[in-house]
Curated annotation (Swiss-Prot):
Name under which the protein is recorded: Dynamin-A
Region called G4 motif, residue ranges: 207-210
Annotated ranges, domain Dynamin-type G: 22-296
Pfam families: Dynamin_M, Dynamin_N, GED
Keyword terms, alphabetized: Cytoplasm, GTP-binding, Hydrolase, Motor protein, Nucleotide-binding
Organism: Dictyostelium discoideum (Social amoeba)
Region spans: G3 motif: 138-141
Localization annotation: Cytoplasm
Molecular function GO terms recorded: GTP binding; GTPase activity; identical protein binding; microtubule binding; phospholipid binding; profilin binding
Function field: Function in membrane trafficking processes along the endo-lysosomal pathway.
Family as reported in the entry's similarity comment: Belongs to the TRAFAC class dynamin-like GTPase superfamily. Dynamin/Fzo/YdjA family.
Gene3D superfamilies tied to this protein: Dynamin, middle domain, P-loop containing nucleotide triphosphate hydrolases
Length: 853
């Protein structure tokens, strides 16, 4: 056990040559405020005057005080005492006043004479038969107010220095507090509590007990009743200023201290646990037991540090040989290792991979599957294309002719415009992968490569040029992929929604919209009927008044209903199409409600209606079915099917058949004698192009009626059908200005109004665009990552080593490339010195065989 403290002293000497304590050696740290008597306690422990004295801050650097006990000579002769400084290893100071002067000189050398402080410690060894084996660290006293040229933050500097020592878990804290101050205001105890809140490694020292006011004592503090500490409190008596002036020796003051505690009426009960001698023995035991408990961990730490430093030294390598052969072999070895690490980083085979984030090839996979794929999926197939753009493209594609079908060239133009949008994110994906490969190169930091600054810079330059060279064909391939998709629009692709599928989809969609609208009209009518019935009941009109005023109410109701139907027909394109279809084709015009018809007659059969009229198309059919209703329904269904296909295929503009093949019915809806309204035509059928299949007489009547209506419409300006809307738009231009034509505008845009046919065609193009663009997106998402991997990533992996050898393996470059940096040479020397120190420390620790005794 007696050898433990000298062992720690040797370890401190060994590590102090490095200027640091990497092992956190066990030590005792003395902390106290300025003028707390801290230095006097240390002098009492040593038994000699050797510390600087004066006003203000005196201790301005940490003092590591190593006390070594010398045995007394057998003949009883006096044994010499001396001190040694680590910065003067060959000088022995027998005069302790010279030790004081050397402390002042070395402090001024480091901090100057302006009362500044420094964290660089002073190591002092004192050999004496009057001391116990002990190691203490005396820190500067905590001050509040700067003195002289001290910086304004002197208090914070001292606190940081103190905390750096006492926060170590192997440090025993000696908190010095004068007895004539309030213990609650003790700076030493406050700092100790911050790092040792439970007080397990803090021992309190109460100084200046003899200077307390008469009638007061520190018994409560010394017994631990005020602030409990595991190691307790010890009281000591310091020399007074009068004793110092009288040159009273420390040994005499120690004797006076013993007598003080024995004769004091209160402290005599704890005299055997008070005084400087008891403090020295207590600290000696605490330090020895503390060293004993921490010694096994110290051995493990020393062994681990030795292994780590040896591994670090191996990365710096040995000094280079002068021969060209050895330099060339070393260069090839470094290139091979770097190339292998580059490939392994991409393939995920690198051993020292990070566990906290994605690295290397995993980041490239993230770019493909998360960033690029997500971006392509979010591209809207119809973004940047409005309905007007689609209609304008279709009209431009037909030229001066009216096409029978939707021009396919318009679909191809719109598809190509959208496919080109995939080129930018694909090219950006190439840049992302290129940057990621550069990131891998910069992060590799091969240990063998870090020795040579010039070689490292040239390797990175060559690899970046290689990546840049392979990036060019990669981007070219991406451009070709987009051009391939735009070169041929494969409408025969199995995944393309074309042909009957798209027609059926749009037809069902159109039917659903029309049914929903008719259902809304029916609901509105029923709601109106209920409101009228409730209003009649609330008015309490008698039967006579009902008889007199009934017809007027019914007429008013019928007029309101007709207005509502006309408004719905004018605002709803589907209802217009239905009404126009019934007027175009045989089967009779839409039925109109008679002025004197009662509301309850709407639900009865056709016997209550005139012979050539049917029920209004906008009024719900709630009555039982009859032949007329069936005929009307069949005609309506036939017309719906015909209008669907006629919206896709263009018929010839025969004047007798309207604008696109349907019979022109202007001014015939109210003509009961018109051939279109005759019941004999209710059974006629129509082909899919909107043409009429009927007898010759009916065809002639229809043609004559249509021609007369076509001529009359010029003067009457009455166009109930949407097929004549284009004629109305330019009527004034041709007939209102004589024989002069308007000037042709420099820019002609498609009209804003869309006919039902144009709506159908644009909707068809939109559906086809979405279907085909999704096919292209799927192809591009698959082809772009494959192209990048082949042309950029894999090509770089295969050619990196050959490229480095071809560019760098030249004898005239060996000296330049293999020149070591000064930092590497300095680190190699530091590692060798650390290895030597750790080996000595390991030998010192191994000197203690049985440290448990």
């Amino acid at each position: 056990m007696d050898q433990l403290i000298p062992v720690i002293n040797k370890l401190q000497d060994v590590f102090n040559t490095l200027g640091s304590d990497p092992l956190d050696l066990p030590q005792i740290v003395v902390v106290g405020s300025q003028s707390s008597g801290k230095s006097s306690v240390l002098e009492n422990i040593v038994g000699r005057d050797f510390l600087p004295r004066g006003s203000g801050i005196v201790t301005r650097r940490p003092l590591i005080l190593q006390l070594t006990h010398l045995p007394i000579a057998d003949d009883g002769s006096q044994t010499q005492e001396w001190g040694e400084f680590l910065h003067k290893p060959n000088d022995m100071f027998y005069d302790f006043s010279e030790i004081r002067e050397e402390i002042i000189r070395d402090t001024d050398r480091m901090t100057g004479k302006n009362k500044g402080i420094s964290a660089q410690p002073i190591n002092l060894k004192i050999y004496s038969p009057h001391v116990v084996n002990l190691t203490l660290v005396d820190l500067p006293g905590i001050t509040k107010v700067p003195v002289g040229d001290q910086p304004t933050d002197i208090e914070q500097q001292i606190r940081r220095m103190v905390m750096a020592y006492i926060k170590k878990q192997n440090a025993i804290i000696v908190a010095v507090t004068p007895a004539n101050t309030d213990l609650a205001n003790s700076d030493a105890l406050q700092l100790a509590k911050e790092v040792d809140p439970e007080g397990k490694r803090t021992i309190g020292v109460i100084t200046k007990l003899d200077l307390m006011d008469k009638g007061t004592d520190a018994m409560e503090v010394l017994t631990g009743r005020v602030i409990p500490l595991t190691l307790g409190f010890i009281g000591v008596i310091n020399r007074s200023q009068e004793d110092i002036i009288a040159k009273k020796s420390i040994r005499e003051s120690l004797k006076s201290e013993i007598l003080y505690f024995k004769n004091h009426p209160i402290y005599k009960s704890i005299a055997n646990r008070s005084g400087t001698a008891y403090l020295s023995k207590t600290l000696n035991k605490l330090l020895m037991f503390h060293i004993r408990d921490t010694l096994p961990d110290l051995k493990v730490k020393v062994s681990k540090m030795l292994s780590d430093v040896q591994g670090e030294l191996s990365t710096y390598g040995d000094p280079l040989y002068d021969t060209k052969n050895s330099q060339g072999a070393l260069l090839l070895q470094i290139i091979t290792i770097f190339s292998s690490n580059f490939k392994d980083a991409i393939d995920g085979k690198l051993t020292d991979l990070s566990n906290n984030e994605l690295y290397g090839g995993a980041r490239i996979s993230y770019i493909f599957n998360e960033i690029y794929s997500h971006c392509v999926n979010n591209i809207d197939p119809l973004e940047g294309i409005s309905l007007n753009d689609i209609r304008t493209t279709m009209r431009n594609a037909t030229g001066p002719r009216a096409a029978l079908f939707i021009p396919e060239i318009s679909f191809e133009l719109l598809v190509k415009k959208q496919v080109v949008r995939l080129e930018e994110p694909s090219a950006q994906c190439v840049e992302y992968v290129y940057d990621e490969l550069q990131r891998i190169v910069s992060q590799l930091e091969a240990k063998e490569l870090s020795r040579f600054i010039n070689l490292k810079a040239r390797v990175i330059e060559v690899v970046n040029n290689l990546l840049q060279k392979h990036k060019v064909p990669t981007k070219t391939m991406i451009e070709h992929l987009i051009k391939i998709e735009t070169a041929f629009i494969n409408t025969s692709h199995p995944d393309f929604v074309g042909g009957e599928g798209i027609f059926e989809s749009l037809y069902k969609k159109q039917q659903l919209q029309q049914q929903n609208h008719l259902q809304q009209l029916q609901d509105q009518y029923q709601q109106q009927q209920q409101q009228q019935q409730q209003q009649q009941q609330q008015n309490g009109i008698n039967n006579n008044q009902k008889g007199d005023n009934g017809n007027m109410n019914v007429n008013q109701q019928n007029m309101n209903q007709q207005n509502m139907n006309q408004q719905n027909q004018s605002t709803n394109p589907f209802l217009q199409q239905q009404q126009q279809g019934q007027n175009k084709y045989p089967g009779g015009p839409p039925a109109q409600q008679q002025p004197n018809q009662q509301p309850n007659q709407l639900n009865k059969g056709p016997q209550n209606m005139p012979p050539n009229q049917s029920k209004p198309s906008s009024i719900p059919q709630n009555g039982p079915n009859n032949n007329n209703n069936n005929n009307n329904n069949n005609n309506r269904q036939d017309h719906q099917q015909g209008s669907f296909f006629s919206s896709f295929f263009r018929a010839s503009p025969d004047p007798s058949l309207g604008q696109y093949g349907g019979a022109n019915n202007s001014n015939n809806s109210n003509n009961p004698t018109s051939p279109i309204n005759s019941s004999s035509n209710s059974g006629n059928n129509y082909n899919t192009f909107g043409g009429q299949q009927s007898s010759s007489s009916s065809s002639q009547q229809l043609q004559q009626s249509s021609q007369s209506q076509y001529k009359t419409s010029y003067n009457n300006n009455n166009n109930s059908s949407s097929n004549n809307s284009s004629y109305n738009r330019y009527q004034d231009d041709f007939y209102g200005r004589g024989d002069k034509l308007n000037q042709v505008p420099s820019i002609i845009k498609a009209p804003d109004d869309l006919t039902s046919k144009e709506k159908f065609e644009t909707e068809l193009i939109r559906e086809l665009l979405i279907s085909y663009f999704n096919i292209v997106k799927k192809n591009v998402k698959d082809s772009v990552p494959k192209s990048i991997m082949h042309f950029l990533v894999n090509q770089s992996k295969e050619h990196i080593q050959n490229e480095l050898v071809a560019a760098l393996y030249k004898e005239e470059l060996f000296d330049e490339l293999l020149e070591e940096s000064p930092q590497i040479s300095s680190k190699r020397k530091s590692c060798k010195a650390m290895i030597e120190i750790l080996r000595k420390a390991n030998e010192i620790i191994n000197e203690i065989r049985d440290f448990r005794n």
